[in-house]
Amino acid sequence: MYQKLPNATLLKSGHLSRQFRKIGIFTFHDACDFVWKLPYGRTSDKSNWLLVLSERTGTCSTKHALLKALANELSLNINLVLGIYPMKESNTPGVGTVLEKYGLEYIPEAHCYLEYKGKRVDLTRHGIRCDEEITEFFIEKNIDPDDIGEKKQGIHKNYIKKQYGIDKFKKIWAIREQCIGAL
């Protein structure tokens, strides 16, 4: 999966490189493997991607933002992408029961991943088998690691408001939160 990305030896002087080196990780690919294998879960501050290392968990946003920041430190030309996709059981196992309860086929969900030379690399959930990969996106936008908090949420909420209207927004967002809780 992460072999599609360029590799580099971590720096002795870089802040993030030092954090990874302290735990025995010395290359970008090793950092990708480590982060990919961490369990899926929100950190105590969902916009602070540095917490992935200390809390040993992360979401698509925090895991990929951390790796993008490390790539920046190593001068690797890798993009952090925010995409809005149709979240459904076949591409996000665990959400089907919630969607079925409300008679929904899908809910537009924000997803972050890395991109290199036109290839998507998703290191969110290791070992999870899906009937289909997430390949359909309504929108895709390059973002910076520090955009995974309010800016990402704003883009996501605005998309849902446009899709369903202001009147239904709160209900759809609440269903979305139930879906995330089911993961």
Residue ranges and their predicted role:
Residues 30, 65-66, 109:
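Short Gly/charged-rich anion-binding patches and loops
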Residues 2-4, 8, 18-23, 40, ...:
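His-Asp-centered catalytic microenvironments across diverse enzyme cores
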